Every structure is written in structure tokens, then in C-alpha cells.
């Protein structure tokens, strides 16, 4: 039999070794993190959901670093946490949950760059009683987070409608507008709670704005659980695989969706909403808007932007083989379009961005486009602005003067506006967030 004292001694030695190893590892991580901070210096925080760390409260435990699925977004330097790779943060929110001292707050927008979002309470209800918002429309772009919001919003609806009793004849418990990740998850949750529900979408099939992504685009998500379907273990997947998943979900759960239907108006009658659609009216006690930010594409406001060769999305780069392409924008959508076009034979690509550096793109995208420029595959025109678009040519201006760029095709990829007409119709108020937590003020 091994003496008890020997066992205790061995355990003590192992603990001491572990502590020394952990301390050394922390020093190495801190050194690497300092380099990371230098590398990403000047990169603006994203306007989407991201963490702000209170240095007076942070104890440097690095729980946030370990919890973040993106790995490089957060670091600990000199005993304090930092959002180092701001562009790499995609709003998981796991850091806030993991922090043992509540030093992290999740906010939208920054002091430099505000973001317009509908105001919602903790149950995702807007100031307009009975109208809820979930997913990208409310600033939650990550697929897993959007699905969770959809489910939680329906939980609140189910609780409220249960207290009210049965709905009047001909009136649904819930109308869901949008069949993207949030809308799909909300539909499943409504079915699970036994609510009478109708889900409609103006598009022709499931997936919402995901279907407009370029072919083969990598979509970032996290493991999620869908009501009536079960756990889905995904972190990086393609656009096509994600759409396939949603089709499988609908088939196996029996969820039904009405496609190609537009909302044209809404009014309140006898305590419920009567929503006018292109397929006729629908009456519902509650409405969940899960449309994503599918308002009008932002445009440049220059002569020629309405010409036929100007596009506001890139769905398939293979359609543009051999073309001279101008991409306008400095976010991930623009850079990913450049990367996709650069793989096609004969394409000649120019990327115009109004700022002097890429402030809002993921590190892998920034590195890739910079490498394409170094290889001569892409012409980068930073700190430039489009002045005029004509057939086959585009005129730009930068610090050196005016330039004429060949452009058989112009892709204006500078984001989309909120669907303000839809929101106004439902009486939803929009607020500009500048580094503030979501919720009413």
C-alpha cells in the first residue's frame, strides 16, 4: 500500500507544477496579446453587438478569452481584458456570461459610429405593445443568437397570450414576418407552445437574407438548439449547407411558411392587429418581426448609380468571368466579394473604400485582400470616393486627384438601411445606439 503521506506529497508537487506552468502560460499569453494589440491598433470596434470591459472591475481572470469562440477577439494584457481584434468579434456574447466579476457589458454602436436599431425590452417587445423583434433586425446577426432570440420572444408571447385566454375566432396568436434564422426558430417555438401561428416571407424560399450571400460564403455560427428538431452543432458552415439545414428542419418538423408574401399595411382593431398582405389580410394578437435588415440597399448618391451594370449584391462570381469589376465598400461583404471575384478567370478587380484603412473586416479578410493587392490581383484604392458612373467606366477621386477606372460591373456593397416603412407601419420606434446596451431609455 502506498503511504498516504506519499500520495499527499505527490499531489502537492503536481499542484505546484501546474501553478508554475499556468503562470508561465499566462505570461506567454500576455506577451502574445500585447503583440495582438499592436497589430490591431486603430481597428474600430464593430457597430454590432460587442463587449466593453470595465478596467476598474476586470480582475484579469481570462475567463472571457477562453469563452470566446472566435479565440482572437479578446486578450488579457497586464492583468486587464481588451477587445483586441474588434473586427473578429461577431457578437456571441459568451464573454459576458463567463466573466466572474460582471466587468463586461454588451453594447451596440460606438461613439464614432452609431447604429440605428429598434428599441426592445428584455422580452424583445418594442414600445408598441404586442410587436416583437428578433434576429438581425434587432442587431443580432449571428445565426445562433438570432435563433435564440426568436425562441425567447415566442416564450414571452406564449406567456402573455396564456394569461389573456383563448384568441377570438379568426384571430391568430402570432404572426411572424420573416423566414430567416430567427423566424424559423420562432415558428418552431410557437408550434411547441401550441400557439396558432402563420409565418410569411417576401422571398421565394427559406433562409431570409442568407440566400443573398455569395455562393460558398462561410457563415459563422455556434451550436444551437431548435425546438422540435434538437441540437445543431455548427461553428463554420457554408451558405448552401445552412440553407439545406433549414429545409431539413422544415421537412422534419412539419413547419409551414408562406413565401412570396409582402406586408402592405397594418391597423389595430378591437385589441388585435389586422395585417394587410399581398395574399390578403391576417389577424393576430401578437406580431414578431424577424425580417433582418432587408430594407433598401445603401447607395452612393452619384450620377449613374441606377445604370443596369450597377449591382448591390454578388450572388455568383462565376457570372462575371472576364469582366472588369469595381467593388465599392470596406466591410466584410465587399472584401468577400473581391475574394470571390479574384478566383475567377480573367477578372480585373478594383476595390474602392472611402477610408484609409480597413476598420471593420475580419482579420482573415483583411489579410487576404492585402495579399491579393500585393500579388497584383486586386487594385486597392483606399481613401477614395466614386464621383460618377458611366457605361464601362467609373470616375473616382482620391488625394492624388481624379481617376478613370474600367468597370464592366460595379458592385455597391455598403450595407442596407433598416426597413423603416415596415417598422413605422407597426409603430416601432428606432434609436441610434452609440456604445450603449440594448433596451429602453
Residue ranges and their predicted role:
Residues 38-60, 74-91, 111-122, 137, ...:
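Ferredoxin-like iron-sulfur electron-transfer modules
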Residues 123-198, 313-358, 401-403, 415-425, ...:
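Rossmann-like dinucleotide/flavin-binding elements
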Amino acid at each position: 500500500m502506498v503511504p498516504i503521506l506519499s500520495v499527499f506529497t505527490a499531489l502537492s508537487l503536481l499542484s505546484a507544477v501546474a501553478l508554475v506552468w499556468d503562470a508561465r502560460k499566462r505570461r506567454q499569453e500576455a506577451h502574445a496579446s500585447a503583440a495582438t494589440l499592436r497589430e490591431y491598433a486603430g481597428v474600430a470596434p464593430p457597430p454590432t453587438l460587442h463587449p466593453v470591459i470595465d478596467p476598474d472591475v476586470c480582475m484579469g481572470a481570462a475567463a472571457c478569452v477562453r469563452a470566446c469562440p472566435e479565440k482572437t477577439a479578446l486578450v488579457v494584457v497586464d492583468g486587464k481584458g481588451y477587445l483586441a481584434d474588434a473586427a473578429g468579434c461577431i457578437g456571441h456574447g459568451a464573454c459576458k456570461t463567463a466573466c466572474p466579476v460582471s466587468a463586461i457589458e454588451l453594447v451596440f454602436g460606438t461613439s464614432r459610429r452609431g447604429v440605428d436599431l429598434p428599441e426592445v425590452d428584455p422580452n424583445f417587445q418594442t414600445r408598441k405593445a404586442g410587436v416583437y423583434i428578433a434576429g438581425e433586425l434587432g442587431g443580432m446577426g449571428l445565426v445562433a443568437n438570432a435563433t435564440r432570440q426568436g425562441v425567447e420572444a415566442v416564450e414571452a408571447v406564449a406567456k402573455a397570450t396564456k394569461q389573456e385566454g383563448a384568441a377570438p375566432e379568426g384571430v391568430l396568436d402570432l404572426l411572424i414576418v420573416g423566414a430567416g434564422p430567427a423566424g424559423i426558430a420562432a415558428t418552431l417555438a410557437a408550434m411547441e407552445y401550441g400557439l396558432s401561428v402563420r409565418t410569411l416571407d417576401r422571398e421565394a424560399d427559406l433562409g431570409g437574407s442568407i440566400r443573398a450571400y455569395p455562393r460558398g460564403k462561410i457563415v459563422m455560427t455556434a451550436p444551437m438548439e431548435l425546438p422540435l428538431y434538437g441540437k445543431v452543432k455548427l461553428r463554420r458552415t457554408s451558405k448552401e449547407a445552412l440553407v439545406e439545414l433549414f429545409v431539413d428542419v422544415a421537412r422534419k418538423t412539419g413547419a409551414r411558411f408562406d413565401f412570396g408574401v409582402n406586408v402592405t399595411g397594418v391597423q389595430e382593431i378591437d385589441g388585435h392587429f389586422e395585417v394587410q398582405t399581398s395574399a390578403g389580410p391576417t389577424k393576430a394578437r401578437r406580431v414578431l418581426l424577424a425580417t433582418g435588415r432587408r430594407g433598401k440597399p445603401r447607395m452612393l448618391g452619384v450620377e449613374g448609380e441606377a445604370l443596369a451594370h450597377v449591382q448591390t449584391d454578388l450572388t455568383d462570381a462565376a457570372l462575371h468571368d472576364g469582366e472588369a469589376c469595381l467593388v465599392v465598400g470596406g466591410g466584410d461583404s465587399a472584401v468577400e466579394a473581391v475574394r470571390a471575384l479574384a478566383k475567377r478567370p480573367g477578372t480585373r478587380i478594383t476595390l474602392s473604400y472611402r477610408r484609409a484603412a480597413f476598420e471593420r473586416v475580419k482579420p482573415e479578410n483583411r489579410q487576404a485582400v492585402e495579399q491579393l493587392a500585393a500579388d497584383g490581383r486586386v487594385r486597392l484604392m483606399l481613401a477614395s470616393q466614386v464621383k460618377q458612373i458611366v457605361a464601362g467606366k467609373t470616375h473616382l477621386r482620391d488625394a492624388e486627384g481624379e481617376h478613370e477606372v474600367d468597370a464592366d460591373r460595379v458592385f455597391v456593397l455598403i450595407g442596407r438601411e433598416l426597413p423603416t416603412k415596415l417598422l413605422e407601419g407597426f409603430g416601432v420606434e428606432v434609436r441610434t445606439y452609440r456604445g450603449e446596451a440594448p433596451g429602453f431609455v
